[in-house]
């Protein structure tokens, strides 16, 4: 069977449309690391100063990293979030929100105003988010049912939580599972972390 030139062009255009275009709001060091991982999985990578045309390549995934935010980056995040559709994915990595009040307030503002599909952080960062969003004392929950608060937060915000400690804990509010990432059985820890992002 021979394919016509139009058929081949149609297939290539369809494939280009299905590949994820990921827009990252992060510092330059993080951008370099993520670009390699995203391109390895055939994704297209974009950031504020990239030369990609947003009309030709519509963004379908937004990655937000709160580790080095300034007022200009916050404005870029707001613009990108407003432009996102419901079917597009937004990932928020909650770096440093357990220690800095302005990042905590920014993260809560983003979570409360926009649909965030995935929130990733350490145990203390996620617990800080839960504590300040619910504005309740956490001693009501005993340690034996500690995952209940994660599932409840995930269900309430309609998001997937990825909690990064020795093991990865992932929940969508209804189900939960652990991935042991502390051994180098199949990947090194940095590559595993980038894949979850």
Q: Over which residues does each language-model region extend?
A:
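Positions that flank functional sites
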Residues: 52-53, 98-99, 169
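Short, small-residue alpha-helix embedded
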Residues: 128, 188-197
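N-terminal loops that bind phosphate or other acidic moieties
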Residues: 2-20, 27-34, 38-40, 108-109, ...
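Conserved beta-alpha-beta core of the PfkB/ribokinase-like small-molecule kinase fold
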Residues: 61-63, 69-145
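Conserved phosphate-donor
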Residues: 144-188
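Conserved N-terminal subdomain of the carbohydrate kinase-like
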Residues: 2-90
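General beta-strand structural signal in soluble alpha/beta enzymes
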Residues: 45-48, 90-94, 118-123, 161-165, ...
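Structural alpha-helical scaffold elements that stabilize or flank donor/cofactor-binding regions
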Residues: 55-56, 110-112, 153
């Amino acid at each position: 069977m021979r394919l016509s030139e139009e058929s081949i062009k149609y297939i290539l255009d369809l494939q280009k449309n299905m590949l994820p275009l990921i827009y990252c709001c992060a510092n330059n060091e993080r951008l370099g690391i993520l670009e390699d991982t995203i391109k390895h999985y055939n994704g297209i990578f974009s950031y504020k100063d990239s030369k990609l045309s947003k009309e030709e390549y519509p963004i379908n995934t937004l990655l937000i990293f709160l580790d080095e935010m300034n007022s200009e980056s916050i404005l870029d995040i707001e613009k990108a979030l407003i432009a996102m559709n419901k079917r597009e994915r937004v990932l928020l990595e909650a770096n440093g929100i357990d220690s800095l009040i302005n990042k905590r307030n920014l993260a809560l503002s983003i979570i409360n105003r926009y649909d965030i599909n995935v929130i990733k952080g350490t145990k203390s960062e996620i617990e800080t988010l839960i504590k300040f969003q619910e504005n309740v004392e956490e001693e009501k929950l005993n340690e034996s049912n500690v995952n209940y608060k994660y599932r409840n937060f995930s269900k309430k915000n309609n998001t997937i939580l990825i909690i990064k400690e020795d093991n990865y804990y992932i929940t969508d509010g209804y189900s939960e599972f652990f991935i042991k990432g502390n051994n180098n059985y199949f990947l090194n820890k940095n590559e595993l972390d980038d894949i979850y992002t």
